[in-house]
Structures are given as structure tokens and as C-alpha cells.
Amino acid sequence: MNFLVVDDNRLLNRFLTTFLRSKGHAASSLTDGSKVEAWLELNPCDAIILDIGMPKIDGLTLISMIRVRYADLPIVMFTGLGYDEEAMQIARKAGANGYVSKGLGPSEIYSALLRVIGQHDAVPKAA
């Protein structure tokens, strides 16, 4: 599988992409949310891990933009806000398939990715 990690924290991006690669996946990262749409045009991916709070363009706005062209692409919101119920509902309403706290370890984040991909695969395709 091919994953995209989008977070303005370069160290966290490097850590997550290295972890995903250690699991046998392709993984790329961007620190600037405004570059995601152009990146997706050239690089198909299976899922995105997307930070909610980024400069230039926040994750919630970015989800709305992604959903215009990539309605079925699994997106996991990644946030330092912890498990705030209101933030989780806002993320889901914006189009996120999952929500993960930055306080979790890489294995838990990986499990969340696999869950949303599993949910995505379970959704019947429109004819």
C-alpha cells in the first residue's frame, strides 16, 4: 500500500513514513497542506494521514478540497488535540474516515490506517 502523511512537523513526518516503510509499504510526506492536491494528481495513494492544525491550510479545509476529486480516498485525521469528542465529530462531518491522537504510538496509528482501509474496501462501489 502507498500512504501519504501530511503534517507540518517534519520530524513526525519522517518518523511515520519510516515506520510505514518498515511495515513494507510505500510512504511519502508533505509538510505543506497546500501541496496535497498537486501531489495526489501525480501520485495515487491508498490512504492519507492528515494533521488537523497546519499553517496555510488546516486539515478540515483540506479534507473538503480532497473530497471534491477523491471522494473514496481513506483519510485519517491526526491531531494533538487528543480524543476530543467535538473535534472527532467535526472531522467526521468534514469527511474523515478515522481520527487518531498524536499521543498514540506508531502501532496504534498503523491500526487506525488499516481499519479505515478495511472500511473503505467494505463499501460497495457504485455502478
Model-derived segments and spans:
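Two-component/phosphorelay signaling modules centered on CheY-like receiver
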Residues: 10-28
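The feature encodes the CheY-like receiver
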Residues: 13, 55, 83
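Acidic catalytic/metal-coordinating carboxylates
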Residues: 32, 58-61
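Alpha4 helix (beta4-alpha4-beta5 surface) of REC/receiver domains from two-component response regulators
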Residues: 61, 82-98, 111
